[in-house]
């Protein structure tokens, strides 16, 4: 495990998170039905620049991510530059790290600033579950390539004769992990059984998340970090997340059937995140450049870590591996944190990680530590609600977490906060921010 990180540039300046913004998050096929991830990305980056009153020519790089790729626009970052008011000379490239994608884009920009290669950049991510790349079967794809090479009508006819009716059916994007064949929901169900997570506890966490998110919106706490999004044909707009159960009642959660193991399961649609559309972004600068331009940053990056574990062994345990590494690099312990933001992909996954944070056995056997990461103080944990309520556009969640924890720390007078997430492929991400 790496020792303490020194996240300052050659002049001793920290990485400033100047501001962050996101679209409202919307359930699949609702407010953003027909709006691509690229269009949502352009929306949020344009608005972020506008609100920051920053000359676009000063932005040296955009690193942006997407999980559900658009074949027509594989480099979403560059398309955002070309499709907004940004200067065409702005460098741009795309990244993907499953549900930790915008953690990665943020770190990439931060590292470029740390090396002195630049001083101002934007990072973020966007995903649409409503505009999907619908593919074709392998046999049809093979046949289409052969058709392109065929010269005669007879050759083309023989190629068509190889196909059956089922080969002509469209193929939606895979929801299963490529290596295991398991969906994320099946993995969460597996974790619920491994760690004895009860249905009642899962439902209680989901109810808490929706209740806190409702209170957060009603208190106006998200006004600075969520934009109003106007969508074609521009007769309506969305300015609030539409997955939140504003009248959440705990007893109603018990009525839903298990979604992934019908007979013996406990993971339901109510204690899982739904397929979601949305985009988010953060503006990063060197501390000196931010102050020279008159900005008061919402926070600074103190440390970060990425980890990977076996996909066959409860692969959504990323926070339990990445968090202790980020804490060590920051020279901190869990109890030193003011706030903790953990991505709630599923209530089962979240509760399993929370359980392992407090497990000395897990720490000794899996982390090589002689003490547990620490028991989570619920008064610090996801205090504004989490992904179970807000939703989860895969590539957008990381920068939502980072922005949200910075703003809440600011409201509380400063401190340090953890943002952490699991990701497909057994990946994990954690970032510690400090706010003055």
From Swiss-Prot:
The active site is at residues 99, 392, 422. GO terms for biological process: fatty acid beta-oxidation. Pathway: Lipid metabolism; fatty acid beta-oxidation. Its EC number is 2.3.1.16. CDD domains: thiolase (cd00751). It is found in: Cytoplasm. Keywords: Acyltransferase, Cytoplasm, Fatty acid metabolism, Lipid degradation, Lipid metabolism, Transferase. One of its GO terms (cellular component) is cytosol. Catalyzes the final step of fatty acid oxidation in which acetyl-CoA is released and the CoA ester of a fatty acid two carbons shorter is formed. NCBIfam families: AcCoA-C-Actrans, FadI, PRK08963.1. PANTHER family: ACETYL-COA ACETYLTRANSFERASE, CYTOSOLIC, ACETYL-COA C-ACYLTRANSFERASE. Belongs to the thiolase-like superfamily. Thiolase family. This is 3-ketoacyl-CoA thiolase. It comes from Shewanella piezotolerans (strain WP3 / JCM 13877).
């Amino acid at each position: 495990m790496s020792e303490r990180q020194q996240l300052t540039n050659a002049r001793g300046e920290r990485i400033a998170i100047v501001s962050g913004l996101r679209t409202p998050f919307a359930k699949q096929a609702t407010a953003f039905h027909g709006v691509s991830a690229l269009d949502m990305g352009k929306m949020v980056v344009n608005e972020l620049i506008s609100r920051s009153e920053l000359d676009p020519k000063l932005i040296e790089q955009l690193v942006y991510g997407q999980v559900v790729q658009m074949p027509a626009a594989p480099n979403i970052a560059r398309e955002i530059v070309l499709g907004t008011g940004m200067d065409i000379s702005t460098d741009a490239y795309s990244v993907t790290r499953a549900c930790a994608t915008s953690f990665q884009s943020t770190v990439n920009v931060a590292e470029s600033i740390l090396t002195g290669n630049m001083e101002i950049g934007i990072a973020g991510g966007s995903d649409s579950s409503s505009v999907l790349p619908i593919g074709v079967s392998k046999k049809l794809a093979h046949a289409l390539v052969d058709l392109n090479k065929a010269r005669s009508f007879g050759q083309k006819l023989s190629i068509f004769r190889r196909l059956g009716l089922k080969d002509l059916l469209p193929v939606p994007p895979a929801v299963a992990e490529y290596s295991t064949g398991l969906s994320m929901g099946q993995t969460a169900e597996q974790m619920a059984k491994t760690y004895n997570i009860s249905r009642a506890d899962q439902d209680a966490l989901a109810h808490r998340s929706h209740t806190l998110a409702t209170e957060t919106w009603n208190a106006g706490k998200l006004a600075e970090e969520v934009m109003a999004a106007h969508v074609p044909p521009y007769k309506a707009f969305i300015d609030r997340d539409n997955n939140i159960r504003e009248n959440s009642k705990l007893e109603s959660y018990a009525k839903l059937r298990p979604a992934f193991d019908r007979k013996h399961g406990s993971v339901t649609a109510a204690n899982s995140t739904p397929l979601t559309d949305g985009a988010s972004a953060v503006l990063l600068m060197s501390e000196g450049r931010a102050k020279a331009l008159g900005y008061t940053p919402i926070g600074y990056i103190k440390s970060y870590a990425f980890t990977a574990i076996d996909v066959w062994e409860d692969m959504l345990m990323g926070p339990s591996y990445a968090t202790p590494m980020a804490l060590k690099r920051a020279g901190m312990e869990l109890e030193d944190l003011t706030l903790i933001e953990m991505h709630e992909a599923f209530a089962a996954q979240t509760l399993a990680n929370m359980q392992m944070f407090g497990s000395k056995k897990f720490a000794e056997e899996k982390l090589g530590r002689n003490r547990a990461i620490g028991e989570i103080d619920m008064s610090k944990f996801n205090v504004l609600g989490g992904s179970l309520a807000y939703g989860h556009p895969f590539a957008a969640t990381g920068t939502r977490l980072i922005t949200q924890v910075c703003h809440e720390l600011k409201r509380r007078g400063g401190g340090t906060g953890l943002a952490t997430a699991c990701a497909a492929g057994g990946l994990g991400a954690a970032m510690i921010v400090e706010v003055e």
